[in-house]
């Protein structure tokens, strides 16, 4: 949608005024920013008509001509084995401190280029197109800068739609995970977070394209399942050494386990040191490799190359029964 000229609504401002008494402009009711940031109806926003056409051309460059073809492979000139040393120092020492997941994306994709989908809507999760060694991928990433990267109703809808789109057009999925949980709250429960969150699990489990998951920090409980864990069909799972893979945070778990223990503080510290790592999960086969952050790009590219011939046979169905 184009700012200032594009508008969409079921009933216009005059009808809204006559029925509800609310005064609202056409731009505020159904303008470009309204549908890009509040309703989620529009996926992209443009400054003017020329910018809109340029964005359409750029988007089509990532996509195949139809669902029977593969996405085009482009020579981007970026070394597939390139490593960015800055990634090793990106995450803050405090595991509860925020960082910008876009910094990770820019460091690992070809030439740092990506195309955001619904950039202004549900900012706690990122959905974008990018390339690895010239191959189009769809990236789904938690954004710790907003709501600590928690999944909520809008984030679940946004990511589910994107996952299914990528699967429909044979575009591999790369998932960057730093998720502490589903957003708690009365309004989330009343709004059906269980039903909306289930859409993500359904979309991932239904997708037959290659799926590569990289855990950067937190991967807790059901929210990690919803971000394409191995159990949801991830073909390859990599974890940074900073990863915490568990049902809940180790500090919270220790407070429950040792709440009546006289040496609670010491045992809590020992528990956190032992379990706030990806190595227990790796021992059990839930993680394929623990990697240095700077190695993320070559590992993802190698995984995608290995999965290039992946094919899954599914029962013929008219359509699946997603929990709408």
Regions flagged by a language model, labelled:
Residues 1-324:
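Ligand-binding clefts of soluble mixed alpha/beta catalytic domains
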